[in-house]
């Protein structure tokens, strides 16, 4: 895989550079190599291949939710309303997830280890998302989208298969997650290769702009976490409070379980017939 080879080469180069700097300044070799680079030198892949057919399946299910349970059951206005609400919900969620995976400590936590390492590598190789097919980047969400789909389905069945708004909101959350991946990809894309409509949306504040996202790639990487850019300030404010890894993991798990449920309840009250 092209991105994996590039990352591995960059890892070796970065490691050699770190050692060389240590030798030249102190005469001894110190253990100053970043943890993610140590992992790669130890045999782990910085990026792994995801199952791309799952992406197609998740997109189809999401569209089914939006058409069958959104437009046909809830109506057009509630479905559009759900989009507006879930835009903010997904953006905040993406920021929280970003904080979690940017935390080096989580490279040692089961299930979080691989994606956390990939996020660390993204700081070394910012354009990695542009060097591979878009569907491959969408595949990075396979686990988290699959988890949401299982949760939405279980709650829908448990509720007597009548909670159409839950699946509508859930469909939007999954589709907007992929839109977030596209936003992020275009924020790193060369202007000459970026679609004109994306540049237009970036210039008008509808898509994440390269200038805004560059802020996150400037050390200490503690700003502009959100992929859609509408809830940046609360995530940044929380991120600078030094609340600790456990707090952020707990917040991430809580949002995974409850944000769409709470949003769907609110929407159901607003659009009650």
Residue ranges and their predicted role:
Residues 1-173, 182, 204-273:
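Non-catalytic, topology-defining segments of multipass membrane proteins
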Residues 198-202:
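Low-complexity, glycine/proline/serine-enriched flexible coil segments
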Residues 86, 172, 178-191, 195:
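Flexible secondary-structure boundary motifs
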């Amino acid at each position: 895989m092209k991105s994996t080879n590039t990352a591995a080469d960059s890892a070796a180069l970065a490691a050699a550079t770190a050692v060389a700097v240590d030798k030249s300044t102190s005469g001894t070799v110190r253990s100053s190599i970043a943890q993610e680079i140590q992992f790669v030198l130890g045999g782990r892949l910085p990026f792994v291949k995801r199952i791309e057919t799952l992406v197609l399946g998740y997109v189809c299910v999401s569209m089914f939710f939006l058409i069958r349970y959104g437009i046909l059951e809830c109506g057009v206005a509630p479905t559009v309303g759900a989009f507006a609400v879930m835009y903010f919900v997904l953006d905040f969620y993406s920021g929280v997830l970003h904080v979690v995976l940017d935390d080096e400590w989580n490279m040692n936590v089961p299930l979080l280890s691989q994606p956390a390492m990939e996020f660390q590598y993204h700081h070394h190789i910012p354009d990695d998302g542009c060097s591979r097919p878009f569907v491959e980047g969408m595949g990075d969400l396979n686990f988290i989208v699959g988890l949401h789909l299982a949760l939405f389905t279980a709650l829908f069945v448990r509720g007597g298969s009548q909670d159409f708004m839950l699946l509508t909101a859930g469909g939007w959350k999954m589709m907007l997650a992929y839109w977030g991946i596209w936003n992020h990809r275009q924020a790193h894309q060369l202007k000459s290769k970026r679609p004109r409509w994306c540049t237009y949306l970036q210039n008008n504040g509808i898509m994440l702009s390269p200038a805004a996202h560059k802020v996150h790639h400037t050390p200490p990487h503690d700003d502009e976490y959100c992929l859609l850019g509408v809830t940046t300030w609360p995530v940044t404010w929380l991120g600078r409070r030094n609340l600790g890894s456990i707090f952020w993991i707990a917040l991430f798990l809580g949002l995974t379980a409850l944000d769409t449920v709470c949003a769907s309840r609110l929407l159901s009250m607003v659009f009650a017939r």
